């Protein structure tokens, strides 16, 4: 019964959010490169279906070949998120009390709004301290997230912006670093949790990992990401600004997320093991001669 009620609520929310059919038909008939409609919000760039397809293909191939191109990853994320996936993610926020508050308040995650110096002075077990420490360790800033341009619906554009700005909190929550191996693992988690196509494409870059990295992803981090992303609560519904002084272990427990093995420590241990093995072989060769 509860499942039917939930589905009914979701249908009402989806129908309420869609524009009238007459508007859809009219805009479809008139929209072309030479007759582009006005933007729906500041910075919005309306695209035709052909333009959106071209953007998705070009940015998708480019970001697969060079995962460091954040601009291409952002463009691919927007080009593939609508008309379906970003609406589904928005509807999951609407069905959650905290998600609805986030959509109403429209908070932004920046170095100014978060007061990073204050977070550095919080107790070490808090979310805020872990987030600031992760930023410092990885050398990144919350102010580098690109503004959304290609999502047509203004509310859904905010959902995509919120997802981008929360990404570093996901890193800090699970302790994964920013280099490729860590990003692939986190993107796999995000794909299982959010369903956004861009995060799924990023998982395919696992095929570009080195042999040892691929083995770790296949044996450890891939299964961890799939299991935890699917079983945990929707991380898009976390009001991070209100959780900064929360114990990070308790937040993971509340969300149903297991912390994965320390990737940096694992890589370091493997490097030291290889170094020791190499030194041992060198000693044996020297003794033999």
UniProtKB/Swiss-Prot annotation:
**Catalytically driven reaction(s):** a 4-hydroxy-3-methoxy-5-(all-trans-polyprenyl)benzoate + H(+) = a 2-methoxy-6-(all-trans-polyprenyl)phenol + CO2
Binding residues for Zn(2+), per the UniProt record? Answer: 167-168, 171, 183
Q: Which cofactor does it need?
A: Zn(2+)
Transit peptide: which range?
A: 1-31
What is the species listed in this Swiss-Prot or TrEMBL entry?
Answer: Pyrenophora tritici-repentis (strain Pt-1C-BFP)
InterPro entries per the UniProt record, alphabetical: Coq4, Coq4_euk
Q: Which HAMAP family match?
A: Coq4 (MF_03111)
Q: Does the keyword Zinc apply?
A: yes
The record's family statement is: Belongs to the COQ4 family.
The protein's UniProt keywords, in alphabetical order, are: Lyase, Membrane, Metal-binding, Mitochondrion, Mitochondrion inner membrane, Transit peptide, Ubiquinone biosynthesis, Zinc
Task: Give the protein name, as stated in the record.
Answer: Ubiquinone biosynthesis protein coq4, mitochondrial
List where Basic and acidic residues composition bias occurs: 266-281
Q: Where in the cell is it found?
A: Mitochondrion inner membrane
Gene name per UniProt: coq4
Membrane topology field: Peripheral membrane protein
Oligomeric and partner information? Component of a multi-subunit COQ enzyme complex, composed of at least coq3, coq4, coq5, coq6, coq7 and coq9.
Question: Which pathway is it part of?
Answer: Cofactor biosynthesis; ubiquinone biosynthesis
A GO BP annotation: ubiquinone biosynthetic process
User: Which EC numbers does the record give?
Assistant: 4.1.1.130
Keyword Metal-binding tagged: yes
Upper lineage is: Eukaryota, Fungi, Dikarya, Ascomycota, Pezizomycotina
Q: Name one Pfam family in it.
A: Coq4
Role: Lyase that catalyzes the C1-decarboxylation of 4-hydroxy-3-methoxy-5-(all-trans-polyprenyl)benzoic acid into 2-methoxy-6-(all-trans-polyprenyl)phenol during ubiquinone biosynthesis.
